[in-house]
Swiss-Prot record:
Family label: Belongs to the calmodulin family.
Binding locations of Ca(2+) 3: D88, N90, D92, E99
Source organism of the structure: Arabidopsis thaliana (Mouse-ear cress)
Entry function: Potential calcium sensor.
Domain EF-hand: 1-36, 37-72, 75-110, 113-148
Keyword Calcium: yes
GO molecular function, one term: calcium ion binding
Binding site for Ca(2+) 1: D14, N16, D18, T20, E25
Name of the protein described by the UniProt record: Calmodulin-like protein 7
Entry keyword set: Calcium, Metal-binding, Repeat
Residues annotated as binding Ca(2+) 2: D50, N52, D54, C56, E61
Gene: CML7
Annotated Ca(2+) 4 binding sites: D126, D128, D130, R132, E137
Amino acid sequence: MDPTELKRVFQMFDKNGDGTITGKELSETLRSLGIYIPDKELTQMIEKIDVNGDGCVDIDEFGELYKTIMDEEDEEEEDMKEAFNVFDQNGDGFITVDELKAVLSSLGLKQGKTLDDCKKMIKKVDVDGDGRVNYKEFRQMMKGGGFNSL
C-alpha cells in the first residue's frame, strides 16, 4: 500500500485524530467494515506491533498491522472457497439441492437427510431465487453462523 493510501486508511481508524489508534478505535472500525476479530486476538496483534510500547498504534505500526489483517482476511477467504468447493461437487459455481444432500449425508449430519430438508435450507439463503446457492450466498450464510443457523 502506498504512503498516501496508508495515511487515508489510518485516518479512518484514528477517530479522534490524535495520531494514534487505540484498541477500541481499531475494533470499532474493523467491525464497521464487517471484520470481526476477538478482543483477545486484537490485543495480541497490537502487542506484537506496538514497537514503542505505548499500547496504541501509530502510522508506522499501522502499516504492519494492516498487512497482518489483510493476510488473515486472505486466509479466511481461501478457507471459505475451499469449503464452498466441497459442496459444489461438479465445480459449476453453484450448490444444488442434490449436492447439499450428498455432502451432508456423507458427513453423517441429521440436517439435510431428505431432499425436502435441503430445499428448505437452500431457500433460506438463496437470495436471487434460482434454487441454488452461489459463492456470495454461501459466504453470507457462513458469516451468519453456517448451517447451524438454518
